[in-house]
């Protein structure tokens, strides 16, 4: 058994240093930012390398086996390069597997355990005696580029989808008061953030748990309700992008805000399947025929609306006929952005008891057919943009080409707009790009 690394600390007069690894979804990234903001306020500095830090924090993901493997690999790297490691995040909610492989970790905590992580850091390497609070900018420490930021409006989820263990990891829905969310958003915009990406486990359920209670914002009371919060965010002067929106009827209310230009005409809506029988086994809401009618209505109100969704193929018991239902629905819906995942069992999920697994080769073939169908849809939609002038937020500039995203593209998961330019263009600028060429995911053109 390896001996626990001896306590160490910064050189006399130097600030203690933290190295940080953040894995998983945008909600986990927000958790990481909160921890770093707290530690930075206490005088800790951020190290670029594990071997230059006094302690390493790894924020893990534990949703899928592949995510667990990535988390364990990251922990292993931190142990090898530093040896003084604190683990937190979703995988930490079930610490036995982590401790079995890495018994000498300083601490293992679950998700949202901010105070426990900070306490473990204090024990490993105490903060400076006189921390300078002005080390932290008003908007906090962000791990995203300066021009966009994730805005988490709630924790947890009260749905009980059979393939998901998020409620057991993060608990039931807990919404933030609207005024708290808006104050954070305002600080971000004042700090130069051009795009706010609203995230949670179930964005459209925001406020249900606190009965849509009001809180004071500026000169008025604002309800903790999906529409009300979206409307107020739309007044801050930044792009506002809505993620993880379930297709509830009250989502209809925000579409006019998109048509008016208050928020981006973009909905990230994880539908997961279209066959009623599969959705029933998944314990998912939604009549898919009704969803088609709703999507048509949304597009009539807001013709520029881009809809992103994710789907699972190979769910236990999925027949060829049920998969064909999904393909037919996809062709009818004509969604702009789509991701597809082969079903992967998750320890603790009730779907594991369904039996009748789909063979791996069949799952892979269905994913191929699904994406082939979607790529054809996406290419037709993209080609319709050729000749148009689109606003694009610039993410990078290199070699006379700016790469960014249109209003239809979220960072990391959607397409890229590649634009040649002659006048100066900087990261974070919002420029107009004339589109000359289209692929299924990316667009090409020049800055107008």
UniProtKB/Swiss-Prot annotation:
PROSITE patterns per UniProt: MTTASE_N (PS51449), MTTASE_RADICAL (PS01278), RADICAL_SAM (PS51918), TRAM (PS50926)
GO molecular function annotations of the record: 4 iron, 4 sulfur cluster binding; aspartic acid methylthiotransferase activity; metal ion binding; protein methylthiotransferase activity
Pfam families per the UniProt record, alphabetical: Radical_SAM, TRAM_2, UPF0004
List of residues binding [4Fe-4S] cluster 1: 25, 61, 90
Residues where [4Fe-4S] cluster 2 binds: 157, 161, 164
CC terms in the record's Gene Ontology section: cytosol
Regions that span the bilayer: none
BP-aspect Gene Ontology terms: tRNA modification
Function field: Catalyzes the methylthiolation of an aspartic acid residue of ribosomal protein uS12.
Record's protein name: Ribosomal protein uS12 methylthiotransferase RimO
Record organism: Methylobacterium radiotolerans (strain ATCC 27329 / DSM 1819 / JCM 2831 / NBRC 15690 / NCIMB 10815 / 0-1)
């Amino acid at each position: 058994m390896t001996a626990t690394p001896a306590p160490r600390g910064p050189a006399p007069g130097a600030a203690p240093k933290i190295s940080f690894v953040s894995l998983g979804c945008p909600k986990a990234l927000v958790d990481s930012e909160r921890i770093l903001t707290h530690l930075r306020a206490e005088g800790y500095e951020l190290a670029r390398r594990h071997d230059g830090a006094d302690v390493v924090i790894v924020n893990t993901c534990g949703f899928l086996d592949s995510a667990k493997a990535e988390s364990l690999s990251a922990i292993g790297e931190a142990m090898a390069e530093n040896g003084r490691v604190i683990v937190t995040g979703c995988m930490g909610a079930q610490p036995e597997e982590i401790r079995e492989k890495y018994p000498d970790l300083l601490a293992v905590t679950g998700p949202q355990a901010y105070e426990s992580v900070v306490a473990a850091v204090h024990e490993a390497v105490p903060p400076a005696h006189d921390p300078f609070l002005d080390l932290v900018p008003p908007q906090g420490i962000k791990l995203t580029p300066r021009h966009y930021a994730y805005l988490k409006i709630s924790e947890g989820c009260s749905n009980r989808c059979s393939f998901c263990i998020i409620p057991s990891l993060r608990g039931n829905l807990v919404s933030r008061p609207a005024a708290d969310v808006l104050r954070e958003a305002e600080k971000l915009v004042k700090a130069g953030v051009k795009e706010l990406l609203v995230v949670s486990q179930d964005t459209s359920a925001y406020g249900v748990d606190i009965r849509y209670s009001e809180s004071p914002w500026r000169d008025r009371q604002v309800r903790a309700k999906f529409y009300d919060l979206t409307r107020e965010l739309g007044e801050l002067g930044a792009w506002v992008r809505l993620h993880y929106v379930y297709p509830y009827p009250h989502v209809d209310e925000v579409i006019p805000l998109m048509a008016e230009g208050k928020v981006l005409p973009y909905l990230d809506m994880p539908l997961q399947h279209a066959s009623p029988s599969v959705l029933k086994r998944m314990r998912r809401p939604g009549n898919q025929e009704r969803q088609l009618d709703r999507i048509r209505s949304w597009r009539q109100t807001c013709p520029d609306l881009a809809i992103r969704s994710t789907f699972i193929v190979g769910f236990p018991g999925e027949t060829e006929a049920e998969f064909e239902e999904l393909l037919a629905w996809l062709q009818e819906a004509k969604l702009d952005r789509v991701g597809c995942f082969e079903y992967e069992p998750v320890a603790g999920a009730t779907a594991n008891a369904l039996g009748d697994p789909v063979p791996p080769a069949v799952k892979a073939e269905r994913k191929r057919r699904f994406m082939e169908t979607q790529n054809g849809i996406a290419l037709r939609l993209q080609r319709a943009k050729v000749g148009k002038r689109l606003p694009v937020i610039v993410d990078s500039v290199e070699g006379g080409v700016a790469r960014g995203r249109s209003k239809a593209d979220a960072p990391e998961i959607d397409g890229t707009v590649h634009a040649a330019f002659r006048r100066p263009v900087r990261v974070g600028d919002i420029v107009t790009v004339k589109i000359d060429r289209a692929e299924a995911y990316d667009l090409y053109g020049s800055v107008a």
